[in-house]
Structure formats: structure tokens, C-alpha cells
From Swiss-Prot:
It comes from Homo sapiens (Human). The gene is GLT8D2. The lineage of its organism: Eukaryota, Metazoa, Chordata, Craniata, Vertebrata. PANTHER family: GLYCOSYLTRANSFERASE 8 DOMAIN-CONTAINING PROTEIN, GLYCOSYLTRANSFERASE 8 DOMAIN-CONTAINING PROTEIN 2. Belongs to the glycosyltransferase 8 family. This is Glycosyltransferase 8 domain-containing protein 2. It is an enzyme of class 2 (transferase). It is a single-pass type II membrane protein. SUPFAM superfamilies: Nucleotide-diphospho-sugar transferases (SSF53448). Residues 1-6 are cytoplasmic. Pfam families: Glyco_transf_8 (PF01501). It comes from the Eukaryota. Glycans are attached at N234. Residues 25-349 are lumenal. One of its GO terms (cellular component) is membrane.
């Protein structure tokens, strides 16, 4: 009897151990793969870098902003976060246009720009009053508007993106450079563009070299200029170098001494940037900023060249939603109709 009792005890012990092993395996099998699966599903999202794109939406040209956003979103698989900047009286309209159109799927934030930061920094100028609009200076204040990003893309509203914006975002900024721009002398079609009457591509076209403050900079007037309508910016360097403060200093000096004006090349927003960033910026692939499409309504690019371009910019007076203008078919293909019916195309005289 004693032997039988011991055998039963051993069998019972083995049964308990077996049950424990089975239970452990079942629990382990049910949990570990789930964690692995979670890791596999979450890792791509965690590793996918968010690309912040800053673009302004002015009341009278909001359709331009929406077309630009549509072209960017439609030509990339990247994770884009649009920062749409406007004045207080336009914020509701911006949101309604996005949420009640094909753009409703985009990831976006609406940012209010307070024009009071410009008080005393803009000299009244009647030659091109549109260049004095507050949103034209948003690019000066990027770190104050965008906080959690190391690298940011800024775009003017009168652009269309035909390439993958990821390529532009991947632009390499040299050590110590706060921004990258496209040089005006590096355009692939420079010979054709330079035939446009009044086009400037040097500092002489932007700064008044008769003024002592400009002469004292020691910058040759024949130095190639750049266009700040497309910017890839490093926010850490921007803040470290106090770029915004430097720009404001030259804005105030212009109010006092009239160092530049919109009657010259790029007007009041480009000139201070040319001064502050002189010799301290990286370059963007020229195909990522094909510009001057709004300079002359009679000047046209070849179709082949336009197809090669990654980004088209209608800088100048002749906008593609208005008349007269050129290559407006390329712009209109990305146009998002205004749900409120306020913004309308004007392609006829």
C-alpha cells in the first residue's frame, strides 16, 4: 500500500507539472506573438518622420494655398504635416475649405500670425503694396510658429509641387547653416530667363548700394542672389544664430534709412534675408525651385523643361489664377474649388 501511495503521489506531481507546462506555453504563446505583432505594426509609424510644411493662406489668394497643398499631398507617400498660417479673420474659412473639400484627409494645423510683431518694422511703400502684406513676413518667424520640429519646409503660396516633397526635405544643410535656398544664378534655364526684362539675379537688384549701411557690408553688388520662396530650414541653427532678431534689425534699419524697396527686385522680404544669410546658406536642387513663371505673361518655358521641374513658382505679378498668365493649365489641374464660392478663377480679360 505504501508503494502504491508513493506511485500515486509521483503521478500526481507529474500531472501537476505537465499542466503547469501546458498552461505556461498557452499563455506565452498567446501573449508574445501579440507583442511582436504590435511592434511590427507600430515601428513603421514610429520611424516614419513627420515632414512639416509651412504655407500661408491670405484672404484674397487662399485658392493658391489649397492648390499648392493638393499638389504636395498628391505626389508623395510621406507623412506630411501642413502648418497653414493665416490672420485671425481668415482662420475659420481656412478650416472650412480644407474640411469641406478633397483636402479633408490631410494632416494639418492652422496657425494664427499676429501682425503686431511687424509694428514699426515695415516702411510704407506704394510701388507693390501686395509685398507689404503681413503674411509675406511669416518666413522670418518660423521658430516662433513651429516648435517641435528640427527641420522645416517653407513654401510661398503661388507654387505647385510636381515631385515628391520628401526629396526636398532630404536637402542636406551644411554644418552651421540655418537654411537652404535656390541660387538665382543656378537655374537650368538661366539663359532663357535672363532675357526677361527687368529680372534681377544679383544683390544690386535688391539693395541700394548708394547707402553707407549697404556699402559697409562689403558684399559685392554682383553677388548672386537667392529666392526665399522655397526654404528648407534648420530650426536649431535658426534659433542659435538668432536669425529672426537679425532680420528684424535690418527691417528697422530700412524703416530709418530706406536701404531697399519693393521698386527693386524682390522687395521688402527678400532683401533682409539676402543680407543676413549672405555666405551662410546651403543650396537646393535647382529643379526644386523653377521660378519666374509669373514674371512675364508672354514668356513661356518648353513643355519638356516644365515636366522635368519638381516645383513651379509663379513669382511676379502674373498669377496663374488670374489674367494674363502663363502655364496656368499646370496650376489649374491642382485647383481645389472654394466650398464657399468666394475664390474664383479669372482666366479671361
Amino acid at each position: 500500500m505504501a508503494l502504491l501511495r508513493k506511485i500515486n503521489q509521483v503521478l500526481l506531481f507529474l500531472l501537476i507539472v505537465t499542466l503547469c507546462v501546458i498552461l505556461y506555453k498557452k499563455v506565452h504563446k498567446g501573449t508574445v506573438p501579440k507583442n511582436d505583432a504590435d511592434d511590427e505594426s507600430e515601428t513603421p509609424e514610429e520611424l516614419e518622420e513627420e515632414i512639416p510644411v509651412v504655407i500661408c493662406a491670405a484672404a484674397g489668394r487662399m485658392g493658391a494655398t489649397m492648390a499648392a497643398i493638393n499638389s504636395i499631398y498628391s505626389n508623395t507617400d510621406a507623412n506630411i504635416l501642413f502648418y497653414v498660417v493665416g490672420l485671425r479673420n481668415t482662420l475659420t474659412r481656412i478650416r472650412k475649405w480644407i474640411e469641406h473639400s478633397k483636402l479633408r484627409e490631410i494632416n494639418f494645423k492652422i496657425v494664427e500670425f499676429n501682425p503686431m510683431v511687424l509694428k514699426g518694422k515695415i516702411r510704407p511703400d506704394s510701388s507693390r503694396p501686395e509685398l507689404l502684406q503681413p503674411l509675406n513676413f511669416v518666413r522670418f518667424y518660423l521658430p516662433l510658429l513651429i516648435h517641435q520640429h528640427e527641420k522645416v519646409i517653407y513654401l510661398d503660396d503661388d507654387v505647385i509641387v510636381q515631385g515628391d516633397i520628401q526629396e526636398l526635405y532630404d536637402t542636406t544643410l551644411a554644418l552651421g547653416h540655418a537654411a537652404a535656398f535656390s541660387d538665382d544664378c543656378d537655374l537650368p534655364s538661366a539663359q532663357d530667363i535672363n532675357r526677361l526684362v527687368g529680372l534681377q539675379n544679383t544683390y544690386m537688384g535688391y539693395l541700394d548700394y548708394r547707402k553707407k549701411a549697404i556699402k559697409d557690408l562689403g558684399i559685392s553688388p554682383s553677388t548672386c542672389s537667392f529666392n526665399p520662396g522655397v526654404i528648407v530650414a534648420n530650426m536649431t541653427e535658426w534659433k542659435h544664430q538668432r536669425i529672426t532678431k537679425q532680420l528684424e534689425k535690418w527691417m528697422q534699419k530700412n524703416v530709418e534709412e530706406n536701404l531697399y524697396s519693393s521698386s527693386l527686385g524682390g522687395g521688402v522680404a527678400t532683401s533682409p534675408m539676402l543680407i543676413v544669410f549672405h555666405g551662410k546658406y546651403s543650396t537646393i536642387n535647382p529643379l526644386w525651385h523653377i521660378r519666374h513663371l509669373g514674371w512675364n505673361p508672354d514668356a513661356r518655358y518648353s513643355e519638356h523643361f516644365l515636366q522635368e521641374a519638381k516645383l513651379l513658382h509663379w513669382n511676379g505679378r502674373h498669377k496663374p489664377w488670374d489674367f494674363p498668365s502663363v502655364h496656368n493649365d499646370l496650376w489649374e489641374s491642382w485647383f481645389v474649388p472654394d466650398p464657399a464660392g468666394i475664390f474664383k478663377l479669372n482666366h479671361h480679360s
